[in-house]
Amino acid sequence: MDILKNRNFLLLFLGRIFTNIGDSLYYVAAMWLVYKLSGNPFYSGLAGFLTLLPSALQFLTGPFVDRWSIKNTLVITQVLQCILILIIPITHYFDLLTVQLLLIIMPIVAFIEQFAYPAQSKALPLLLHKTQLLKGNSLFSFAYQGIDLICTTLSGILVALLGAITLYVVDSLTFAITALLFFSLRMPKQTETGTSLSTKQYFTDLKEG
């Protein structure tokens, strides 16, 4: 496929795949770990709610993503997710892991995702010719839906075989790999310069969509 010969698109596409793998592994491992630590289905339900809630707030991130450097946004979001996810196995190792800590980290990681995915979508038309956008979007849809379905299905098996903590270590590794892939991107110069965003301008941009 010719589109995959485009170095920048390939890096972005691979990053998209690893991001989705990381998100899927994290969600299933988190649900399982919360229940294991608490033994209470209420906390599992609360964890699911807190993880899904930020996706309803994605529209609030748009004005920031539109102004920030795409490459910086892509890299920083992955680094932050990597660090936050890694806190889980580290605190577990020192016997400091609690349900409360998980319930704090989960929505933060999920909220960071709301900056990562729009930035990826915004980068796509900057890296592809107009004639390649349809193929590019199709591959991105596969990476988002197909990989998510596969990984969510396999995550339950992996949790049973490896344990949630090991899965968190693998998960943090996927975000680290993605950060390196995005760091290697060569974005057009004009996308590397962000502008400040006043409160008034933020709400104006939010209203305009």
Report each predicted region and the residues it spans.
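Juxtamembrane intracellular "pre-TM" segments in multi-pass secondary transporters
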Residues: 1-9, 188-209
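Membrane-helix interface segments
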Residues: 7-8, 40-43, 67, 97-99, ...
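Substrate-agnostic recognition of the 12-TM MFS/MFS-like secondary transporter fold
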Residues: 10-27, 50-65, 69-84, 101-159, ...
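MFS-fold secondary transporters
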Residues: 35, 87-92, 109, 182
